[in-house]
Amino acid sequence: MDSSYKARKEAFVSNLAGGSILEINAVTLVAPTSVLLWSVLQSRLSFFIPYGALALVTDFFLNVLPILFATTLYSSAPWTLNILLALPALILLFTSTPSRTQQKAKPPRPSAAAKKNTPKHASDSPEPLPVHPFLTTYRAAMMVITCVAILAVDFRIFPRRFAKAENWGTSLMDLGVGSFVFSSGVVSARSILKGRNSHSKKAGLWQRLAASARHSIPLLVLGLVRLYSVKGLDYAEHVTEYGVHWNFFFTLGLLPPFVEIFDALAAIIPSYEILSLGIVVLYQVALESTDLKSYILVSPRGPDLLSKNREGVFSFLGYLAIFLTGRAIGIRIIPRGTSASRSPQQARKSVLISLGLQTLVWTTLFVFNSTHAMGLGAGIPVSRRLANMPYVLWVSAFNNAQLFLFCLLESTFFPSIHRETGKDGELERTSFATSRIMTAFNKNGLALFLVANLLTGAVNLSVPTLDVTTAHAMVVLIAYVAMITGVALALDRANIKLSL
């Protein structure tokens, strides 16, 4: 890469201050609003059954393009985009009646041999840990926003206030990094819950650390590949983001073994929220009462690896706290929650109340931690670079709110998903209530994140992103998200799930 252009690229993403949380909320609200319109079309018209070309294009226009437009063409008017999506949904909602059936797509009937070899209770007994469409949609929407932002940020059409803040401030991309980790924590709860349901003896800590290392190795290898690619291609890099050598793949790769250590502590302190708060409170105390903050932010970089990568090393504590908070939420919302005395409706109401209360609690903690609310707040600014306490609280509050909104939409438009007594019927209703594209994004999220990074690198090496017109930028970005969507759908159609 030409040295002068590389310097321009690095300056383009450096020394930024972020934007307002209210604007970030308006932009990210586009995802639930798009799902609102999708849900009305599906619940009232069974629009996406069968899933033909028109359904595919509409799905793409509803669940992918609005997020791209919210961060580019409508970045200065996100509420306008929200209204444009909500208005047809409300009109259709009040001028049509619910579809008489949500069972147009029947699962294939098992063969006689399969029936004979299948225990009677196998297909009739519902899963204790069912698939939740709202959770699939939440994770997929987060992945779409992440994939959009990592390339769009290199174009001028993407506002600088949405790019990562240098030291202090809130931005869309700052939120996206934390949300990626939070959502990983949410789904990690499934393995914990399976272990509890199996009633088998839990493996020892060293065995679990060895197993977690096997999950870490591919991510650490990807981190090394990215490191050598960036250095070898003389690619523009933002050193103060994670450090000289560190990158996000290293953060993701180191999470599993450290999470296992804190999972062992959960036997003593049976609350992942308390463990999370314990980590971030101690970290924040260290930042405020020692020279750690100035060491991370302004100290000259020494020759040792810690000094060169101090942002990545110390911010890891904040991301670990975020992951544990996500796991705590997953433990609450993933189980079926029904019993002889508790109906599916009551179980869903309990989940909504839990998410609502969690949103309120985390938001309150964030307000008192990051502002001078009522003269009692600490007034500590948010820093993604430090992954400090206000950042952890903000990410936790936001993701709980998003989960609440997606859960509310599912409960409103598809209330009968988990009322089926048989597994086949429940799977059919779950499929009916979930966008095919969102299912595909959720199924291979980490693999798609890797594909998005590779495509971003290819575009930046072949297109002068700082100098292209708005029209050219949008053509590139639409083609980019279409390619990622195509990869996601192809993997899903082939029933391939790449576990990294």
Curated annotation (Swiss-Prot):
It is found in: Endoplasmic reticulum membrane. Signal peptide: none annotated. Glycans are attached at residue 369. Its EC number is 2.3.-.-. The keyword Transmembrane applies. Keywords: Acyltransferase, Endoplasmic reticulum, Glycoprotein, GPI-anchor biosynthesis, Membrane, Transferase, Transmembrane, Transmembrane helix. Probable acetyltransferase, which acetylates the inositol ring of phosphatidylinositol during biosynthesis of GPI-anchor. This is GPI-anchored wall transfer protein 1. The gene is gwt1.
